[in-house]
Amino acid sequence: MARSSGPLCLLLLGGLVAGILSGASADGNGLPSKKLKMQYTAGPLLKFQICVSUGYRRVFEDYMRVISQRYPDIRIEGENYLPHPIYRNIASFLSVFKLVLIGLIIAGKDPFAFFGMQAPSVWQWGQENKVYACMMVFFVSNMIENQCMSTGAFEITLNDVPVWSKLESGHLPSVQQLVQIIDNEMKLNVHMDAIPHHHRS
């Protein structure tokens, strides 16, 4: 039974590696593509820093579409809001560790014997159920990695001036709120530009 599961485990590992490499190709660190969208037009810069792993990319694209129609001169940028380096390092470590662990399970190598320790019962179970063990390692590791990379952020700045922070407010702005904020900021900028500047002779 264990021998017959070998080819299936190898096929599973190949699929997992291919999926990881394809995800890593979006960004050098295996993260989602940092740069989401940029419109090259002259004008104010509206920048979004969002948690891509939280599913906010679709929200960003919807907001971008509405704002682009209403303010065609505004440049819009979006990028992934990266978590603290500690959490990024944990996620990077797990992405490698799970492949090593899956490889050991498939190869039937006992890492505990290298340290002169007796293999725990969970390792013996993994050797008897390699397919399930590989899937469990992969999905549990992915769950922890996603948790480490999820910041919940949806931060918005206009010309580097913060105009909205989900980390502070606890919720996303509605389209109406965002449009009102941009309107107010644009009017304020126009008003400031209209104020005459007196230069000392």
Swiss-Prot record:
Post-translational modification: May contain a selenide-sulfide bond between Cys-51 and Sec-54. This bond is speculated to serve as redox-active pair.
GO BP: any one term: cellular oxidant detoxification
Topological type in the membrane: Single-pass membrane protein
UniProt KW keywords: Endoplasmic reticulum, Membrane, NADP, Oxidoreductase, Redox-active center, Selenocysteine, Signal, Transmembrane, Transmembrane helix
Catalytic activity: [thioredoxin]-dithiol + NADP(+) = [thioredoxin]-disulfide + NADPH + H(+)
E.C. no: 1.8.1.9
Subcellular location: Endoplasmic reticulum membrane
Pfam families cross-referenced by the UniProt entry: Rdx
One term under GO cellular component: endoplasmic reticulum
Covalent crosslink: Cysteinyl-selenocysteine (Cys-Sec): 51-54
SUPFAM superfamilies hit by this protein: Thioredoxin-like
Enzyme class: oxidoreductase
Record's keyword annotation contains Signal: yes
Coiled coil: none
Signal peptide: 1-26
GO molecular function, one term: thioredoxin-disulfide reductase (NADPH) activity
Residues that span the membrane, as ranges: 96-116
Described purpose of this protein according to its UniProt entry: Selenoprotein with thioredoxin reductase-like oxidoreductase activity.
Family: Belongs to the SelWTH family. Selenoprotein T subfamily.
Protein name stated in the entry: Thioredoxin reductase-like selenoprotein T
Gene field: selenot
